[in-house]
């Protein structure tokens, strides 16, 4: 028979006693008040001498996220409308507007729009056609 040297500092909670259960739940210590404190100095993402973000400090995390750089200039500017409310035809129309402005094409065609692409209004058809002919 083994002996256990564990001696709890507090009386264990009887899980069958409802009043003890609620007392244990109500005595949980609260989180620190700094969670919603936004008065701390914001993290400057351009200053490399800035101290690193403490990932355990919620206010520093949110400051780093809120100070994140905008999208790069070449990125397609899809409106802020959520994807759930935007139909696929609306999304494709906005996508092609960005390409015609000379923005980079994401994913399968990372390049500028060419005159050959203007002849193929279907998504990336020009690029796919050219890539198939290269294999011949």
Curated annotation (Swiss-Prot):
Chain spans, region Disordered: 66-86
Keywords: Host-virus interaction, Inhibition of host innate immune response by virus, Inhibition of host NF-kappa-B by virus, Inhibition of host TBK1 by virus, Inhibition of host TLR pathway by virus, Viral immunoevasion
One of the GO biological process terms: symbiont-mediated suppression of host cytoplasmic pattern recognition receptor signaling pathway via inhibition of TBK1 activity
Keyword Transport set for record: no
Pfam families in UniProt: UK
Record's function text: Inhibits cGAS-STING-mediated type I IFN expression and NF-kB activation by inhibiting TBK1 and IKBKB/IKKB. Inhibits host TBK1 phosphorylation.
Protein family according to the UniProt entry: Belongs to the asfivirus DP96R family.
Protein name according to UniProt: TBK1 inhibitor DP96R
